[in-house]
Amino acid sequence: MGAVVIILLTLSGCSIEKVSAQKQDKIEYTILKEAEFPEKVQKLIEENKTKEFQLTYQEQGNLYLIKGYGEQKTGGYSIRIEDVSLWENAIHVQTLLIGPKEENLKDEPSYPYLVIQMEYRDEPVIFE
């Protein structure tokens, strides 16, 4: 069984890489407004917004990190970025979904998501 897994990993081009959990450097990034999203990013969000998701997309020298929290029963949610940093060999992204304040409660469902833009990098991305 173990040999089958190794063969499948080899055939599919996948690799396993150890990721160091030591923070090294902050990364410059921009939080985009919806009007600034590339068309493909908007399409990816629309296709995935009903469930929680984490996606990356690369276009024209930029890397887009997309985090969605799926359908929420009400509106008024916000997302706080806790950390965007470069670890030894990975980009680490940590966000927090913040519930609505009493005065912001709405009866309609919402689909909170966040799009971060940065210069393209080769490192894998870890969402937390």
Give the residues covered by each predicted segment.
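Exposed, flexible binding/inhibitory loops of compact, secreted disulfide-stabilized domains
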Residues: 13-128
